[in-house]
Design a protein with these regions (language model features):
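Conserved catalytic-site region of short-chain dehydrogenase/reductase
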Residues: 337
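Conserved P-loop NTPase catalytic core
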Residues: 348-375
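Catalytic nucleophile serine of serine hydrolases
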Residues: 332
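Flexible phosphate-sensing "switch/lid" loops adjacent to ATP/NTP-binding sites
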Residues: 1-320, 327, 344-347, 370-371, ...
């Protein structure tokens, strides 16, 4: 098998739409009969995923792999940075934690990771037909270029042709694209094979004069004007929109606590698809109101976020509602918070040795450690309202939780998972709603509690829904992008 061809998508800024455009290209190439795989040398995100072999990677490349119809593989994202503070991150290399680093330390040493990047890339290149590479931020960050391993620095390492994407929805797209090109070195400009304007609303004809001027000034072709596509696909850049989401048209109200270090918000995306279940994020006691369900999500810093709950008044409001019978479900860090105590004997979670009082809603005790559990798991829900629901998800957490109450679920070997006490539920399982069975059971239970008939609420299985959204995305991008030019940039003929 010959070595894979490649195409790289770089952007004028964060949020330009690189991730979704890469997902679209992965889907298009797969539809064209090619084995496509995504690649991003370094990703910074709080949302992560555990592969079948128990390794951790960024979810953006997971989504792109799903779009391509291939199994997510840690080689697709060899370096993952998970921010733990404003100036530091947990550094994960080849799916395993390498340690905590301040930004300045990582910047000085990251070139040492180039062999890991190239080994992962070269291995994928031996198996795939096309590699769709995603850059990060902007290639024109002149203060970072000397040590670049994710934009033009990576493009040079793997000899990748580049599409440069600008976001017109936020305005100034011509300045974005022209300014980025002008700040690049000549050899970097030569790598750019086309400019793409993304998230356009309106009549393309109005843009034509500007496109011609842009081509004249940059000496580069505009190979596509991609419309603003209304697709529901997991996207790190869409988090801000989701956090502002308010759905008051559905009869059931689920309130997700908007923790400062919120991670894996994707756990709750399947709930948004249920026709009876409205999902919203809340960040203070006033916003909480009187929901039908409270969801306490995962977090990159359980201790700090528990203290935040206390300081902002949400702890008091949550405890009052729980005492009145409002169901509360905590996932991962949220599960840990629901317990009696959280013990950090080495300071691995909070930076100092301490034992913290939990919310006291579950008979559990958590002890943090440096060791991280990473595993894909299957389980069957044991909690009475949802008993029998089959789950497929993953665990990714530090700390061990001892539970004295009833389990939330059982593993296939009979082992206990999570904890239940009355109307309060806790679990370590991320992705617990993806199969749809728990979503249906949960919504049905909430409907019965409220006297609502759930029989007319048909839920599309998440996997099928995801496929539909990928196809909508691919159709929209294929219709807007000059795919002949994209194939030519890779040295291939269009399929």
């Amino acid at each position: 098998m010959s070595r894979a061809k490649c195409i790289m998508v770089q952007g004028t800024m964060s949020g330009a739409g690189k991730s979704l455009l890469c997902a679209a290209l992965c889907r298009i190439f797969a539809q064209d009969g090619l084995r496509a795989v995504p690649f991003k040398s370094q990703n910074m995100a709080l949302n992560s995923f555990v592969t079948k072999d128990g390794l951790e990677m960024g979810r953006a490349q997971v989504v792109q792999a799903q779009a391509a119809g291939v199994e997510p593989d840690v080689r697709m994202n060899p370096i993952l940075l998970k921010p733990s503070s404003d100036v530091g991150s947990q550094v994960i290399v080849n799916g395993e934690v390498r340690g905590q680093m301040k930004a300045s330390e990582y910047f000085r040493t990251k070139r040492q990771l180039v062999p890991d990047i190239l080994k992962a890339y070269d291995s994928l290149a031996e198996e795939a037909d096309v590699i769709v590479i995603e850059g990060a931020g902007s290639p024109a960050e002149i203060n970072l270029k000397s040590e670049d391993i994710v934009n033009m620095g990576l493009a040079e390492m793997v000899d990748a042709p580049v599409l440069l994407v600008g976001d017109i929805d936020r305005g100034g797209v011509f300045a974005q694209l022209y300014g980025t090109v002008e700040l690049l070195e000549e050899k970097e400009r030569r790598r750019i094979k086309g400019l793409v304007i993304n998230k356009f609303r309106g009549d393309v004809e109005i843009l034509r004069p500007g496109l011609s001027m842009l081509e004249e000034k940059t000496h580069l072709p505009v190979v596509g004007v991609v419309p603003y596509l209304k697709v529901d696909i997991e996207d790190e850049d869409s988090l801000s929109q989701r956090l502002e989401m308010r759905d008051g048209k559905k009869p059931l109200d689920a309130a997700i606590i908007r923790l400062p270090h919120l991670s894996n918000f994707t756990d709750f995306m399947p709930l948004e698809q249920h026709p009876l279940l409205g999902v919203r994020y809340v960040s203070n006691a006033h916003e909480l109101g009187a929901p039908d369900l409270i969801l306490l999500p995962g977090t990159k810093n359980t201790v700090d976020d528990l203290l935040w709950l206390r300081q902002c008044g949400l702890e008091t409001a949550l405890l009052k509602l729980a005492a009145k019978g409002t169901p509360v479900l905590g996932v991962c860090g949220g599960y840990q918070m629901l317990g009696q105590t959280l013990d950090d004997p080495t300071g691995s979670e909070s930076g100092r040795q301490q034992t913290l009082r939990g919310l006291g809603l579950l008979p559990t005790r958590t002890v943090f450690s440096e060791q991280k559990r990473r595993a894909q798991v299957k389980a069957t829900v044991a909690a009475v309202p949802f008993a029998g629901a089959e789950l497929e998800g993953y665990e990714i957490h530090t700390g061990v939780t001892e539970a004295e109450g009833e389990p939330f679920a059982h593993y296939p070997d009979g082992g206990r998972e999570g904890c239940v006490q009355g109307n309060v539920f806790g679990t370590y399982l991320h992705g617990l709603f993806d199969t749809g069975t728990l979503t249906e059971a949960l919504a049905g239970w909430l409907c019965r509690r409220k006297g609502i008939d759930p029989s007319d609420a048909a839920l599309i299985p998440m996997e099928e829904y995801r496929r539909q959204q990928f196809d909508i995305l691919a159709d929209g991008v294929r219709g807007a992008l000059d795919m002949d030019a994209v194939y030519a940039a890779m040295g291939m003929e269009r399929r």
